[in-house]
Amino acid sequence: MRISVRATIPPLIKGIYPSLRPLILGHQQLQQRIHFFRESLRNLRSTGSIAPSSRFLCRAIVRKIDPHKAKVVVELGPGNGVVTRYILRRIGPSARLYIFEINDVFIEKIRATFNDPRMTIIHDSAENMGNHFREIGIEEVDYFVSGIPFVMLPELLTEQITNQCLSWLRVGGRFVQFHYSPLLLGLYRRVFGNLKLEVVALNIPPAIVISCEKLSPANQSLISHS
């Protein structure tokens, strides 16, 4: 049974609840950050960060999503679901969000946090996305949003996953990735043929949002030969 914070407050202090609410919410956010920090230390290779994404980073990421074109959105490595919340706010009521996550703790956290019929959680690695897409009946993806720490993974695996993203994207669709270093910019440019960058300083640590569009074969050929 879900008990609201308001219902647990004695009647004598209900009148000052509005002034207490920021403190209560601040405590909840602190607990979430501590939870993320502990889990990240245990699984730093798969999480890639010791702090959840700031609201400034989340907003920069979802600005790359056109809600009118976002019918199928795939999130890779959502962590504890901070970016997930912003994606669900951004996309329309008929859109679908598919999430790939391998960490059991984060999956349970996301399931407990969100009750949204548009969202499907897939407990598997992103490298196996093709099998799941074919099973579900997905023909193409409009947007990939990735928080996978590719800089900590073997380059061959990174290329395999990003090439799969490219093959499943519709022409004009986007792959959106955030990182904390520019080490893999050359790889994304090589795979997608283009990229745009946005630096988000108000994050711990400062982050880079990378956006790559799937070009038409003709445009891709022009870039390859330029």
Each predicted region: which residue ranges?
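Conserved SAM-binding motif I beta-strand of class I
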Residues: 96-101
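A short glycine-rich, Lys/Arg-flanked "PGG" loop and its adjoining helix->strand segment in the class I
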Residues: 159-171
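Conserved beta-strand signature within the Rossmann-like core of class I S-adenosyl-L-methionine
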Residues: 171-179
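Core SAM-dependent methyltransferase catalytic element
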Residues: 200-226
